[in-house]
Structures are given as C-alpha cells and as structure tokens.
Amino acid sequence: MPSDSEEVCLQQSGTGVYENVVYSKETSDRAKRYAGDTNRKTIGRYSAAVQNLIPLRTTERNKNNGGSRIDDAGLFSFVTYSWVFPYLYQAVRGKLDRNQVWGCSFYDSCGLNMARLEVLWEDEKKANAKSPSLFKVIYRFISTRLWFSCAVFFFCLIFGFIGPTCFIRRLIAFAENPERDEQSRIVYSYGIALVAAISVVEFARVLSYGATWAVSYRTGIRVRGAVLALLYKNVLNSKDLCGKTESDVINIFANDGQRLFDAVTFAPLVLVGPLVLVGGIGYLLMVIGRWSLLGILVFFVFDVIQFGLGKSMVACRNLAIVKTEKRISMMAEIIKYIRIVKMNGWEQIFSAKIDQFRKEEKVQIRKSGYAQSLAIACGPVVPVVAAILTFVGVVLAGNDLLASDAFSAITVYFVMLFGIRMIPYGSRYLAEAVVAMRRIQEYLLLEQYAPYPVTNAEDVVLDCQGATYTYQPKAAKAPVDETKEPTENEVIVVETPVFTCSFDKLSIKRGEHIAVIGAVGCGKSAILKAISGHMFTTDDALSVDRSQTVYVPQKAWIFNGTVQDNILFGDKMNSERYYKAVNGCQLTEDLTTLSVGDRTEVGERGATLSGGQKARVALARAVFQTKNLYLFDDIFASLDKKVANKIHEEIIQKLLKKKALMMVTNNMELLHHFDRVLFVEGGNIVADGNHDILYEKNDAYKTFVDACETYQATSGATSPCGDGPAQPAPLDAEILRNSSEDLKGDADKLISDEEDMGNSTIAWRIYKQYIHAAGGWPIWTCLVIGFIVNVVSNIFSTYWLSRWLKKGHDETTTITNGTEFLEMKTSLADSPVTGFYAAVYLVALVVLTISGLFKACVFVKVSLTAATRLHDRMFQAVIHGATSFFDSTPTGRILNRFSKDMDEIDVKLPFTAEVFLQNMITCLGFLVVITSVFPYFLLFAIPLFVVFVVFVSCFRAGIRNLKRSEHISRSPLYDHVSASLEGITTIHTFQQSNRFLEVLKKHLDCNSGAIFMFQSAMRWLAVWLDLLVVVMTAIVALLTVMLTGTVSPADAGMAIAFAVQMSGIFQFAVRTQTELEAKMTSVERVSYYADNIPEDGEWNTRQGLDIESSWPANGQINFSEVNLRYRKSHPLALNDITFEIKGGEKVGIIGRTGSGKSSLANLIFRLYPVTNGTIYIDGVDIRTVGLVKLRRGISAIAQDPSLFSGTVRFNLDPSLEYSDSMIWEALEKCHLKTLVQSLDKKLEADVSHGGNNFSVGERQLFCLARALLMKSRIVILDEATASVDAGTDKLIQEVIKTVFADATVIIIAHRLDNVRNMDRIMHLKNGKLINFTTPQEMFKDDWSVYKLEDKDDDQHSAVVVGENSEHSMEKSSQGSSQESDDIVKVENEQKDSSDDVVHIESGDDDVKADSSEVKETSSDTDIEVVQ
C-alpha cells in the first residue's frame, strides 16, 4: 500500500492523460511539469530527455532519496553510463542489500507511462472496435524514442563503416608502400594521422552505440511497466477472467513482460542493422569488383537460411510457450492443493503429468534451440565463406589481390556479419513479442466491471424490472485460435448447459433484510454475484448504487498484512465503528490470543488464521464499511451455531438493522428474523415474501423448509463444538498463539533465500552441478574442443590468407639485360603455390562448417539435458518436500522458480553460454595472432590487462547483486498479483481497485528499477571495455606505422583486422561472461530448492515394502505418548496423547480452535514428524511404512472441496485403477450419477481450475466419491460438511453411514450433530486429551446440554451441565459489554485438578443453548463436561 510518507497529488488538468498520476513528496517540480507538458502534448514533454544532452551536469537531485540518477546525468555520463559508477563502487566496498538499489525514475515509472498507454489503447479501441491492435498502440507509444534510437544507431554504423573502408585500408596501403621523403626515409606523420582518425571514428562508434542502448533500455522499461500495469488494471476491473487463471497472469508478468522489453531494446538493431549490408555491398563492388558478387551471393544465401531458421524458431517458440503455460498452470494447482496431493499419495501421479508436460515442452525447446544454435554457428562462417570464394575467384581469374584490399574487405565482411546476426535475434524477439502481445491483448479486451444505473427512489437501494445473467460473456462463441493449445486449467467447453440466473422483478428498500434459500446448485450465490456485477447480461434492467454495496463471498479472502489492515481495507481508522465491527464479529477474544493483537501479521492468504477466524475478519471488513446494501453469501457456513447466532444478533439485527441486507443462508431457524425470503430454484426466484406467509401458502417452500428442519432436528443439531476452519489452515491453529515475528524468525531458511542478497560470487559448486547435470566432464570436454576447433579454423582461414598474400608477393623474377639486373615481384595469380594455398583455404572452410554444426547440435543437447535434470530434481524436491516448507513459503515464490528461473535455464542461459564460449575463445585467438605479429604489443598488453582485470574484478559483485535484486523484487510482485486475483470480487465491491493498483505500481517500479540498473551496469562494462579495445586498436595501428618495413603488410593487415573485430567481440565476451554468471543465479536458486527443501519422509521404506498389500486390514489406530511440536521455539501442539481406536469404530473429535484436532489428523498422515511417541495402525509403527503405502491406505475428505483441472475421471481416479462400472457405482452412491450423465462427455467431461464449474456441494460429493472408490479402512473427514447446505450435509452423512459402515471413521467436527451418533467422542483441549468416551457418557441424559461456546472479548467457552432441575441462573453483573439479556452468572467456580473441569451452578430448568452465555474469570480455562 502507499506509504504514509507519500503525498498524493492528483493533477486536475481537464480530461488529460495524467489525471490520476500519484506523485511522491520527492517528485521534483520538473517532473510534474513534464507530466503536464506530456498531457498537453507540447514540446515541453521532451524537456527531460533534452537535459541529458547537456555535456556535463554536476547536480545530484536524487542523491539521498533513492531515485535513479540517470535523470541528472549529462551527455557523457549518459552515453558512458558513468552515473552507475557510484553504485558499483559501493559494491566493491562490501555487501549490498536490496534497499541500496536505486529506484525507478519518475519518467520511467509504470504509473506515468500506463496513463499515456491507456489513452492510446482507448483511442485504438474506438478506431478499430472489431480488431484493435496492441502492436499499433505500442508503436505509437514508443515511435519517437524508437526512431531516435534508430538514428543514433545509424550514425554508429556509419562510424563503424568508415573505419575499415577509409582509414584501415589506407593504413595497410601505407604499410605496403609507405610515403618517403627525398632521402627515402619513411614519412610517419601520414600514418600517425591515419591512426588518429581510426581512433576518433572508433571512439565515436562506441559512444553512439552506448547511446543507442541507453535510450532503448529506458524505452523498454517504459513499455514493460506500462503494459503490465495496464494489464493488471484491466484484470482487476474485469467482471470475469473467462477461464484464465492466476498462473496465466503471473506467467505474463514473469515472461511476457521481459519478452516485450527485449523486443523493444533490440528493435533499433534489428531495423537498422541490415542496412550495413547495403553499404558493404557497394564498397566491395567498388574495391574488389565483380568477383565480390560471389561473397555477396553467399550473404544472400545465408540470409535465406537464416530466415528459414528464424521462421522455424518462431514456430517452435510459440509452441514451447504454450507448453510452458500448461506446465506452470498444473504446478500452480499442485502447490495450491499440495495437502490434498500428499494426503492421497498422488505425488507420483502428478509427477507423471508434469513429466509429460515437460517432455512436450522440451520437444519444442529442442527444435527452437537447434534453429538458434545453427543461426549462431552460421554467423562466423558467412564472412569466411564469402572471403574465400571472393578471393579464390579473383586470383584464379588472373587478377592481383593486394593486402590492403583483402583485409579491408575481410573487415567489411565482418561488419556485414552484424546485419546477418540481427536476423536470428530479430526473429526470436519478434516471435516472442508477438505471442506476448497477442496474449496480453486478450486480457485488455476483457469486459470491465462497470457501474449499474442508480435507482431514483430515495427509500429503494435496488430495483430490477427483469434481468438475465450468465457466467459466460456475450462473446462466448468467439473464434478459437487453432494454433493455441488450451492449458490444462482452461475451461474450453463446459458441457453443462449455460447456467442462467433470472429474476423478473426485485426491489430492496432501506432497512429491509432478505434471506435467500434453496437447494445446492440452484443459483443462490449467482443472484448475489449478479447484483454485485460479477456476471454477464444482455438485458440488464438492474439499478443499484455499486459504490454503496458490499459483497462478502462464502470463501473468505484475507491478504498478507495485519488483522487491522484486513478490516480497515484502506479506509481511515474510526475507533467506534472498528470496535463495533470487531466486537460484533466475536473477534475480541481471538485478538487477545495473538501476541500483538490486531497488529499481528496473518501471512499469505491468512495462513496463521483458522477458517472461522478468516470468515469473521472478512465479515468485520464489510461491517466496518458504511454502505446502503450488504450482500452476504452464507457467511455463517464455517462458523458454529452459537457463534453464528451471536453474530446474527449483534451484526444483522443490531448494527445493520437500518441497512438493506440480502443474505444466502442454510439455517432455517433464522428465517423468521428476515423481512422477506427469496426461494430459488434453477436460477429463478420462484417465491418472494414473508417467511410465515410463504410457509403457509407455498407448498414447495414449505416442503423445502420442513426437509431442512427435519434433518437438523433428527441429527440432533444443538450447539457447536468450535468454530472450525472453512478451509485447511496450512499451519495448525496451535501456531496461531505465536506471533508473526516468531513465524518469520523461526521459519524455514528457505524464506531467507528470497530476503538475503546471497554471496556476491557464484560458488564453483554451482557450475559443477550444471556441468554434471549436462552429462559430466567428458561431454563438456568434447564440446569445448568443438568450440576450439571451430574458432581456430575461423582464425586460420584469415591467417592462411595472409600467408598466401605474403608468399605470393615475396616471390621475384630476375631479368638480365647486360650488366643491369631488374627484380620484379610476381602477382598472386602468377604464383606457383596459388593452387596449394587455395586448396588449404577450402579445407579450412570445410572444417569450419563441420565443427560449427557439431558444436551447435551438441550444445543444444547438453544444455537441454542440464535444464531437464535441474527441473526434475527441483520438482521432486518440491513435491516430496515437507509440509512445513509450504506453510512458510509463498506460492508465488515457488512458482517463480518454475517459471522465470526455468525460462532462464531453458532458453537464455544456453544462448548466453554459447555466445560466451564462442567469443571468448575467438578473442584469445585474436590476441595470440596479434602478439605473434607484433611482439612489442605485449609491452602495452600487460598494463591494458591490468586495467581490464581491475574493471572486471571490481564490478562483477555489483552486477551480480543487481541481478539478485531483480530476482528478489519479482516475488513480492507475483505474490501481490496472485493475492489480488484471489480477492478480485472483494476488491471490486469495496472500491479498492485503485489502491491495489498503486501497490502494484510500487512493486513493479521496484522491479523495473532493479532491471534497469542491472542492464545499465552491464552496458557500463561494455562501453568501457570497448573503449579499452579502442586503445588497443590504436596501439596495433601505431605499431603498424612505426614498424613499417619490418612487418609484412599482410601480417599487419591481419593484426589490424583482428584488433578492430575485437572492439565488439571482446566486450561482448566479457559482458556475456558476467551475464552468464548472473544467469547462473537461476541455477543456484533451482539447486537450492533441489538440495535444501526438507524431505517429507521415506517414500518407500524397506519395512514398508514388506507389509501385506491388504494393510491396513482392520483400521485400528493406537497413539502412545505422542507429542508434537511444529518448531523448536513453539509450545507443544499435542502433549502426551495416548488412546486406542478400534477397527471399524466411528470416532468424533471435538475441541476449540487450537486444541489439536487437525494436528492429530496431520500425524496420522505423517504430514509432520512426531516429536516423541509412536503411532501404530494395525500394530505397525507408521514410521516404518512408506508414505505412499500409508497415505493410500487412508482416505481424507477435506473441508475445502477442490478439484483439479482435467476430467471428471481424472479427479475420481487419477491413477486409472478402477473400471467405468466401479466409478459409476461410486457416483450413484454419492448422488452424482445423474449430474455426470447429463454432461456431453460423461466421465471425460472437462473440469475447470479448482472445479469452479461445479457448486461447492457437488465438489464435496465428488471428493466423497473419490474416497469411496479407494475403499480405505480408515477415513478421516475434516468437517466435510462445514461449507454446504443442509441438503448436501444430509446426503454426505447418509453416505458416511452406509458406505463406510465397516471402515474406521474419524470426524473432526465443528457441529455436534455430526458426531453425536459416533461410537465415541474425543475431546481435546490445548493439545491434551481431556476426555474420550461414548456420546451417552458425554451427554449423560437428554436434559443435559453440552455447550462449547465461542468466546468474546471478556467471556470464555463453557459447558453448562445440569445435574438436576433445581439449578438457578442469574444475570452477570460484569456483563456490561454484552447486549444480550441471557447472561449467566458464574456463582461458584472450582477447578478440578484431576479432570481439568470447571463446575458451574445455574438456576434455570430450561437452559437454552441459543440464548445463555456464561461468564468466567479464568483467562485460559474452557468450561468442560462434568463427569
């Protein structure tokens, strides 16, 4: 959220581009003027860029505020990146942390640029409503900067072309035929002038090249930030994502944003680079003549080859991206539902699915890699082949070839190579950018969450004269992209008929309370979603003020922050309203259990809160708002009856008494409290009126209500036994008693992997791990030899040409004419060794080609093998990791490894490594040749090398730290996006989209700043190393002049040609080495997960393999003195638990939140290791049983029914063990057969992400059917009916009683009606076993009332037990904070040390569970059953 120190300044300048730009208090007046000038499209919008053209600037406006210093850079600092130097200098002095990375410039911030891009996008949609183009919008967005970059780069090419064509050629000609004075002495001044000219043009080339990247980097950052921010804004404001998932959006942030950045930054090189071919062709025709057409033809042939390779790479990359999306989507589901995967022993099943996705992905990556490597391998071959064919043709045709012409031509060929190399670069980046833009455009075209018309009547808050809503948009029949393969979690076609929600006439007045009831799947929730604006309609006639409407979905959404943050939700604190919301939602006592109360951090998705606490926090958030209309979707589903009744009384009947309210409920007892009841069937409101009138006059309504009440009565629904969670809490409630600081301090060190900047140097073991993963040292040795042979053959071809030229021109013919001797040099064509040299020249060409193909193919195989093994090791470590790892590690952080890091290892790391090896070996070869030609060069090379070592060694740490900072800054960004999408409906209805967008901008700018700093630091190294090579080139040229006559022109020309080529290759080699090391951080991060995630346990132990296949046959469970402690610093979650459950016995477990109920179940599944003690199943210590055997022998039905994307069959039988008849039988027993038969594909029908195309009740029945198929002897239900209506609850209870009659059944209960018919009931308190007896013993007689109440701010749970009818009940004098009249006075409190029981005297014969409340003074004692 925006910090308190930020000053929000909204620019009010009409309907301009920047109406809602947020300025911090550090934002300069110059920046604000820039925004205004850009808004008005005046020349002033270029003022910021013009400032960088000032040669020298000394002001440092951003020195102390963390802003980017590029805004204050002068021209020299801008083009040489000297403004980065202070940061790199700090890196030399010690370890840097993330906070020292300079922030993003205001001019590059995503907020400012998103505003402009949004206007352009809206203009495009208006101009081309049917087919708007994001490509056109981005072009308009960057056109000025793009063409300016192209112009600068054009000058760079001109400078680079002038050097070899004008000055180097003349320098070599000077060496061949030096200018002499009258005394035949060489005149060096002309040669020195040529050296100076070469130095100047090379210096200008380097600076203009650096300027090109400086402009392009800022352009790329602006495009990436603007597009991602606009994407997030559109997604956050969309009605529905139309089948797209969180992982799809995160994948765009992780990969597509970077692809846009790469495409934009390389665009000037791709657009202008090929122009050098035109200049090269003209020069060669002028100098070499018509035979140069052979070389030109070679370039065009290779152009065609490169184009084919590029096209193939494009197609393969597109398919690879689709396959990657499928894998990431499945990984997101696995991580999200990891407990379900583990408890069912499905690790191998999902490993097989991921392995299959990975294989499909590798096929396309391999093809793309081959195309890319062959394109890279073609690069060095092209100028050599062109030169060989050109020179051989010239010589064999009888023409002479001078060294000056030959080596200037070779230099030009290598300059032309730049244009050739841009083709694979351009093809790759363009292909990926096109795919990225196409995918992003789909999100930008999502239908937006628009406001409804506001009703005119003052006393009416909602008015509808007839409307029909669906979950699918109007354009549901849009054409399908044939080239795009659907991801696993996409709902391609939902076979069920399109669900519609209709109501002819509906109005709600102020202060009117309306209940919505109906059977499971009838459309109750749909009505609330339609009113809140989250469904699609074609005939909307609904009028409601959405800004005055609050919607609370059944599944509570909690974001990572404090409890107070979640309740205030961006609003200012109002103590009175806040207290009423917290107190009315029964949160006061819960806050006292947290170490810092409502300032306690709740973790990702509220990880440290139970399900009931999450629901009440979400409700308090809504109650804190002062709105006119409240929409509650079964908010009491995850709460016990007592707590629900209290909240209903305090919140619904009192606090919201004068507000309009519509609430979905399954509690028939509450209907008489509502003014009206809506009865829903099949998506239609079939009855609307007062409960009593409908009950008397509407038979269907009466039948439904009677059925629900009968079920509740016959099942003995009384008081609850705890406010159990609606979803499985990642950490058991015992951990809740520890502060968020404890969680952070004691959490796995894997968390600090993201927080710590790590060591500044990549350890050698990381390289060894990569080498071993690739196949070991032998294969790498062969690969390096292939690179060396390829480079040597390349250099040898030029060396051999110099030998040929030298040999041919050194031969002489003596002519005798009397006493005169005339010595004449023969031409190269007349030399008798021409054939030999030409043949060797051609052999070098063959070796060069073969070695290039060899190293390209082998490198692709080696790098992909390494990536595959690293991925597989990490995946196996994650899926078999301990549950505690997932408790303490955010989902986005894990997905970051499988998406961004694996993309680096799959694609970018191999490319960088291949280029590094090629260029580094080439540079070493060039230096060897130069030194052999000019031994004096060593005198200069030594100090140059020292300068080089100082440059590289001093700043490698800073560059690597910047790369780590970029990695670290991604995780908060992804976590925020993921959390936002999970709570999108809440964000909409609470009008918080803008606030969450501001948080996104903050995270995105932080990430953009790190990316820009890293790229700028890399370019700093490149520029200064290029300048170092310019000095080296000048030295070689000077030696050529000074040693004229002692060194052959051919050798001198070869040395100069190699020195000039090094100007680009050397810095690229060093930069790619540093970039390679930076990209190795991805290998480091992946390897860290692979090696450091604690294991879940032995998958198959030796003892486990010897156990009979029928184990467990009886289902007997024994706990012997079992203790459980989640972390060393935490108290015992289970304390000395000993009990025995007989085979086939039905046991209910009750206790308050934090009592240890879920911990006990966790131990049976071995989700956590036992601290002390032993657990036996059928007499076998479960620690000796493999996890797969143990967990597949136990069935688990969780509270939150979730299905995986795929098919119905896969969700019922993922291991394909059962026949169709067995599956249909299970579906029939679970009352799902009719539903599945109605689907077009029956068992092969598609299931969407999370099973969202089925209702909650249907998903729960599917989970029950899955457990039924397994035929386990032990079944554990973690309150499987907590979130379903009474009808579904009844079905589930019937299935449990009939189908699992012979199995051992353990029910973790939050409703007493679900355990009162058990054989025995286990009562846990604070991790201790308080009581384990029959329901008859626990309840005694019918007149005994067992109450385990929820606690409010000064009241604790109690069990009122009447021994006779003569007890009395009095009103507590200390109950001033309670507005209920039914408060019992504790007259006598006595603690029984042996039974841990508090006795209460009450004095009323009819103590009702729903109305009595018990006060007690002990702060940590629950009132228990009196035996």
Swiss-Prot record:
Q: Which residues of this UniProt protein bind ATP?
A: 518-525, 1151-1158
Query: Topological domain, Cytoplasmic: which ranges?
Result: 1-147, 207-268, 312-375, 421-770, 855-909, 953-1022, 1071-1427
Tissue/organ expression? Highly expressed in the intestine and pharynx. Expressed at low levels in the hypodermis and in some neurons.
Q: Where in the cell is it found?
A: Basolateral cell membrane
Which residues lie within the region annotated Disordered? 1361-1427
Concerning CDD domains, the annotation shows: ABC_6TM_MRP5_8_9_D1 (cd18592), ABC_6TM_MRP5_8_9_D2 (cd18599), ABCC_MRP_domain2 (cd03244)
Q: Which residues form the ABC transmembrane type-1 domain?
A: 151-432, 783-1078
Keywords, in A-Z order? ATP-binding, Cell membrane, Glycoprotein, Membrane, Nucleotide-binding, Repeat, Transmembrane, Transmembrane helix, Transport
GO function terms (MF aspect): ABC-type vitamin B12 transporter activity; ATP binding; ATP hydrolysis activity; ATPase-coupled transmembrane transporter activity
Per the database record, which ranges form the ABC transporter domain?
486-707, 1117-1351
Q: Which GO terms describe its cellular component?
A: basolateral plasma membrane; membrane
Q: Which InterPro entries match?
A: AAA+_ATPase, ABC1_TM_dom, ABC1_TM_sf, ABC_transporter-like_ATP-bd, ABC_transporter-like_CS, ABC_transporter_C-like, P-loop_NTPase
Membrane topology note: Multi-pass membrane protein
TM ranges are: 148-168, 186-206, 269-289, 291-311, 376-396, 400-420, 771-791, 834-854, 910-930, 932-952, 1023-1043, 1050-1070
Biased composition regions of type Basic and acidic residues, renumbered to the chain: 1382-1418
Coiled-coil positions: none
Q: What happens when the gene is disrupted?
A: RNAi-mediated knockdown in larvae does not result in any obvious developmental defects and animals are able to reach the adult gravid stage and lay eggs. However, 80% of the eggs laid fail to hatch, and the animals that hatch do not survive beyond the L1 larval stage. RNAi-mediated knockdown in larvae results in the heme accumulation in the intestine under low heme conditions. RNAi-mediated knockdown in larvae results in an accumulation of vitamin B12 in the intestine and defective vitamin B12 transport from mother to dead embryos.
Function, please?
Answer: Heme transporter required for the export of intestinal heme to different tissues and subcellular compartments. Also, required for the export of vitamin B12 from the intestine of the mother to the embryo to support embryonic development.
What name does the UniProt record give this protein?
Multidrug resistance-associated protein 5
**Lineage of producing organism:** Eukaryota, Metazoa, Ecdysozoa, Nematoda, Chromadorea
